[in-house]
């Protein structure tokens, strides 16, 4: 067993060190073999041999740790020499293309701002009133169960949508209002099509009663979707949202299969892209507005980016793999 420590002293790198460890301490190593021999011994001879094995094993383990420390320090020193960088040398900064989510945000903003929509940014932390109650979602409303919310102890929460920005804007301004808001939102969900943090964009137009009609909303939405996706077909479906009445959802013809039917569109030929509607009077009453009308719409930025980039896993946008991000 003296030869084990002698072999250890001759080790010069991590690979040889691991080989020495396995030959001594592995399942088929020298010490395992010695301990296995104890079953053939009896009495004092067995006890004496066991003590001797333990003595050499402890000596080897101590020598191994010292050698391991020395090898790691030596390899680190060698690596630092090889990786030494001359900071005085010029090095061109590597740039890449815009992140798909940033590209999508900018494309949306470029459409709405020339139409007179003002970009509003709100807080990520909200209270119950702005996130729920003011949007016709009182505490007992079943629609709250659809949103797994991150709550804080002081009755604050991480906003589950960007709609609170609309409430703040209406509280701070008087009609006419024409705004869009975008940013991070949070819900407790994580799978191929959901992440705990995601981005939304919403729009709001408010003016004196009778000045804003559903036809205005329809025109804006159709112009935007044709601008964003090109020559796609559109389908309007009636829907329900507590904060709009009437409400609608808009689908586009599948960009993956051209309506021939595929797994992405569930073989329907249609893909849901946004929800919209005329602002519910209950929302205006919560703000204190009278004799006004307006429309609102909202969509997920990741959803739009997934369709334009034609990817199936939403989580790809949040990974730091440059090979993936540079492919968009």
Swiss-Prot record:
GO terms for cellular component: cytoplasm. Pfam families: Phe_tRNA-synt_N, tRNA-synt_2d. It catalyses: tRNA(Phe) + L-phenylalanine + ATP = L-phenylalanyl-tRNA(Phe) + AMP + diphosphate + H(+). GO terms for molecular function: ATP binding; magnesium ion binding; phenylalanine-tRNA ligase activity; tRNA binding. CDD domains: PheRS_alpha_core. Mg(2+) binds at residue 245. Its cofactor is Mg(2+). Keywords: Aminoacyl-tRNA synthetase, ATP-binding, Cytoplasm, Ligase, Magnesium, Metal-binding, Nucleotide-binding, Protein biosynthesis. One of its GO terms (biological process) is phenylalanyl-tRNA aminoacylation. InterPro entries: aa-tRNA-synth_II, aa-tRNA-synth_II/BPL/LPL, Phe-tRNA-synth_IIc_asu, Phe-tRNA_ligase_II_N, Phe_tRNA_ligase_alpha1_bac, Phenylalanyl-tRNA_Synthase, tRNA-bd_arm. Tetramer of two alpha and two beta subunits. The gene is pheS. It is an enzyme of class 6 (ligase). Belongs to the class-II aminoacyl-tRNA synthetase family. Phe-tRNA synthetase alpha subunit type 1 subfamily. It comes from Helicobacter pylori (strain Shi470). Binds 2 magnesium ions per tetramer. It is found in: Cytoplasm. Its EC number is 6.1.1.20. It comes from the Bacteria. This is Phenylalanine--tRNA ligase alpha subunit.
């Amino acid at each position: 067993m003296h030869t084990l420590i002698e072999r250890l002293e001759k080790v010069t790198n991590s690979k040889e060190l691991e080989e020495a460890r396995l030959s001594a301490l592995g399942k088929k190593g020298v010490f395992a073999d010695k301990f296995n021999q104890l079953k053939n011994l009896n009495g004092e001879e067995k006890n004496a041999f066991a003590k001797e094995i333990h003595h050499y094993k402890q000596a080897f383990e101590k020598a191994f740790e010292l050698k391991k420390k020395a090898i790691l320090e030596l390899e680190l020193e060698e690596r630092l020499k090889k990786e030494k960088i001359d900071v005085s040398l010029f090095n061109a900064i590597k740039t890449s293309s815009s992140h798909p989510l940033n590209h999508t945000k900018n494309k949306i903003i470029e459409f709405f701002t020339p139409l007179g929509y003002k970009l509003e940014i709100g807080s990520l932390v909200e209270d119950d009133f702005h996130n729920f109650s003011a949007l016709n979602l009182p505490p007992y409303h079943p629609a709250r169960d659809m949103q797994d919310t991150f709550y804080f102890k002081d009755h604050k929460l991480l906003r589950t949508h960007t709609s609170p920005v609309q409430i703040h804007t209406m509280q701070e301004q008087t009609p006419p209002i024409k705004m869009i808001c975008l940013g991070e939102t949070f819900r407790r969900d994580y799978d191929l099509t959901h992440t705990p943090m995601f981005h939304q964009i919403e729009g709001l137009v408010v003016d004196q009663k009778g000045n804003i009609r559903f036809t205005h909303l329809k025109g804006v939405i159709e112009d935007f979707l044709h601008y964003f996706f090109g020559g796609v077909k559109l389908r309007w479906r009636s829907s329900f949202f507590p904060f709009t009445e009437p409400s609608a959802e808009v689908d586009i013809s599948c960009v993956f299969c051209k309506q021939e039917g595929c797994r992405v569109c569930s073989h329907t030929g249609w893909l849901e892209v946004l929800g919209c509607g005329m602002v519910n009077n209950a929302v205006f009453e919560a703000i204190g507005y009278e004799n006004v009308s307006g429309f609102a719409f909202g969509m997920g930025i990741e959803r739009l980016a997934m369709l334009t980039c034609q990817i199936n896993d939403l989580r790809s946008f949040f990974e730091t793999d440059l090979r993936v991000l540079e492919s968009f």
